[in-house]
């Protein structure tokens, strides 16, 4: 694999791994505030970030040794309102800056596996941002967000509210490849 795409995969793995941990902590905070659906949303999206990290990791399975992952992260956790704003900022960075650049570099370098991994994550992060914005609107009005079941594809991390699709619109995985967060 070409070095720039390889480093982008390492960085994306680091960023998605950090997002997973951050969202687990944010979920715990929401639970403490009795915002059960916000907590469930953070848990579901944390799981999707875990899937993204795993996809990037699999593209790097040939590596052996220690590597530095340079990735954007957000700090300063607080109440659920602040945590949702931090989550939206992180997702926005991935949508507007990180993944579009990584996709173009992988495409230019003809690294098809990396490109696919980046494209799957990019498509999913847009849904994460929309779900977090919906939750923030509810929290800002003093109530928990109204959410149905949240589905996460175990292959690409695609996340949606509602019924499980027969086929994942991102990666083509079948219905039984989804995990439901109720």
Feature annotation, model-predicted:
Residues 1-182:
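Non-heme di-metal
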């Amino acid at each position: 694999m070409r070095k720039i795409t390889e480093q982008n995969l390492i960085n994306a793995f680091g960023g998605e791994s950090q997002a997973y941990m951050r969202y687990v902590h944010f979920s715990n905070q929401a639970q403490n505030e009795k915002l059960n659906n916000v907590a469930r949303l953070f848990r579901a999206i944390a799981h999707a970030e875990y899937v993204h990290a795993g996809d990037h990791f699999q593209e790097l399975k040939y590596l052996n040794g220690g590597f530095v992952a340079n990735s954007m992260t957000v700090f300063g956790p607080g109440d659920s309102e602040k945590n949702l704003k931090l989550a939206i900022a992180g997702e926005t960075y991935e949508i507007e800056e990180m993944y579009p650049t990584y996709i173009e570099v992988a495409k230019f370098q003809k690294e098809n596996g990396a490109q696919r991994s980046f494209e799957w994550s990019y498509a999913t992060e847009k849904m994460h941002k929309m779900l977090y914005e919906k939750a923030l609107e509810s929290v800002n009005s003093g109530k928990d967000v109204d959410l149905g079941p949240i589905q996460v594809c175990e292959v690409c991390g695609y996340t949606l509210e509602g019924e499980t699709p027969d086929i994942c619109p991102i990666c083509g995985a079948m219905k039984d490849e989804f995990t439901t967060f109720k």
